[in-house]
Regions:
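Register position in tetratricopeptide repeats
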Residues: 24, 88, 122-123, 157, ...
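TPR alpha-solenoid repeat register
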Residues: 14, 47-48, 78, 112, ...
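Residue-level recognition of tetratricopeptide repeat
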Residues: 11, 20, 44-45, 75, 84, 109, 118, 153, ...
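Structural marker of alpha-solenoid helical repeat scaffolds
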Residues: 6-7, 41, 105, 136-140, ...
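TPR-adjacent "capping" and linker segments in tetratricopeptide-repeat scaffold/adaptor proteins
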Residues: 4-6, 63-78, 211-218
Length: 336
């Protein structure tokens, strides 16, 4: 099924509706075949929940929220897609308008309420968001986890990261047999709150179970390597980041992270420069990568080349203090 691993867009809802169609037409084995191609770690909420239903033979759950033979359900989906588009453009008012129409036509599709909660969250209407999140109880395990994460994010906004992570870790500890997606998310939450030791603990739990053929392992090694780097354990950081590049040698962000780490340590400058040239060739309009290669030229005292890249980085990201500091240092060296 070509849409599952298609890198050119998010086809998760189409995959959900195809699985729904197969089940509705009693083509269970075909639905299982599609589900077996999905991975919890890199699937959307809707597909993760769908995979869980298929894996646990809860096929009736699909028909409870959507029917391919119901015209209202179909029209509702088109309206939801329009709403989602406006939400991605942060036009919350228009998004809510189409979302209300969608929910009116198909109130059964309770899982679509995640977009309602997201819109309230983006609008800083946290109490309204929390009321919507109550729709997701434990029978929808992935949506229940979404609820807990969003509640933790709201607490973080109100009271800071420490309160937010305390809430999420408390809820996480009560989940029996958390799946790898939940472990991945809690690791990311710890990393974002700068509790790198705990993040490493959970990343390691997942990494040890993954085969090198899975690209998601490359991402996990990148995240764990970044955590080691923040702790100053450069040996383990370098091991993880190089292992990540062994799996996916064309990941511009891993190339940039490892190279910039080496630059900061005044370590393997020439090799770091080659990695940055490759990263820049892959992502020439990324401000962080552009800044990194400019700073690499600065460190080898090629200030003319450095100025060219850092100037572009400033244009791409004018408010960033680090980029502006780098630009100031280069202009000083050039007596400008």
């Amino acid at each position: 099924f070509n849409l599952i691993n298609n890198p050119d867009g998010d086809y998760s809802r189409y995959i959900f509706f195809y699985i729904n169609y197969l089940i509705e037409n009693n083509q269970i084995e075909e639905a299982k075949a599609i589900s077996n191609q999905l991975e919890y770690l890199n699937s959307t909420l809707l597909l993760s929940q769908s995979k869980s239903w298929v894996d646990n033979k809860n096929f009736k759950e699909f028909g409870k929220i959507f029917s391919c033979n119901n015209y209202n359900d179909i029209i509702s989906e088109f309206l939801f897609l329009i709403s989602n588009l406006y939400s991605s453009q942060e036009d919350i008012e228009k998004s809510n308008f189409y979302l209300n129409l969608s929910n009116y036509l198909n109130p059964k599709f309770i899982l679509n309420s995640t977009l309602v909660a997201e819109n309230f969250y983006l609008n800083d209407e946290f109490e309204k968001a929390k009321n919507i999140l109550k729709n997701f109880d434990k029978k929808y395990e992935f949506y229940y986890w979404f609820r807990l994460k969003k509640e933790a994010q709201i607490i973080t906004k109100d009271k800071g990261y420490e309160e937010g992570i305390d809430y999420l870790s408390s809820k996480f500890s009560k989940i029996k047999n958390p799946n790898e997606k939940m472990i991945f998310d809690i690791a990311n939450f710890y990393k974002n709150s700068k509790n790198y030791e705990k993040a490493i603990e959970y990343y390691t739990e997942i990494i040890s179970s993954l085969d090198d053929s899975l690209e998601i392992k490359s991402d996990l090694l990148y995240r764990r390597g970044g955590s080691y780097e923040r702790l100053g354990d450069y040996q383990k950081a370098d091991e993880d980041l190089k292992y990540s590049l062994k799996i996916n040698p064309d990941d511009a962000y891993v190339l940039n992270y490892l190279a910039y780490s080496w630059l900061e340590r005044d370590y393997k400058i020439e090799e770091a420069m080659e990695m940055l040239k490759k990263a820049y060739a892959l992502r020439s309009n990324d401000p962080y990568i552009t800044d990194s290669i400019g700073w690499a030229y600065y460190l080898i005292e090629n200030y003319i080349e450095a100025e060219k890249y850092i100037k572009k980085a400033v244009e791409l990201m004018p408010e960033d203090p680090t980029v502006n500091d780098h630009y100031g240092d280069i202009l000083w060296k050039l007596d400008r």
